[in-house]
Amino acid sequence: LRCLGAVIDATAGRMTLGDELVYDDGWKVRALRALRRDKIGFVFQAPYLIPFLDVTDNVALLPMLAGVPNDEARKRALELLTALDVQHRAQAMPAQLSGGEQQRVAIARGLVNRPPVILADEPTAPLDSQRAMAVVRILGDMARKYQTAIIVVTHDEKIIPTFKRIYHIRDGVTHEEAGEGRALD
């Protein structure tokens, strides 16, 4: 995921995002900071919230950095916080949140810029079954509404069947199987 997200450099090969060339045989051909900010949403296994910003500002910061007006960025943040059932914690600081609440805020942050690609590493790990399925539904809604590709790495057996395409990596070999695709197309 870190290579796909242009967090670490590819050493060989070619990578494109849509029609844009990102890497070509290890050479960076696009400004990676802008690519990560504007085109890729990250949901890490650990929330990595900024400790001195409240919940709303943690989510609204990325669109603000991308040039979205503050009012619109905060509106988007509050919509996602509501969808993820943490709107009541909008003014709380990260240290005041439970682990599950922190993860839902991190998920909102990954979705708020409406990127064409979302990379999610164990996004449901700290969540109970009900909230995990709610997160998967929200990811599916995002994919449909904004034509977003979502790549999820997970060990959560309960959510795996909800995806349309499923790839397992065993002993360094990738195997594909069909999912039921109820939540994500």
Model regions and ranges:
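ABC family nucleotide-binding domain
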Residues: L1-I169
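Conserved beta-strand-loop-alpha-helix hinge in the C-terminal portion
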Residues: P161, R165, V173-D185
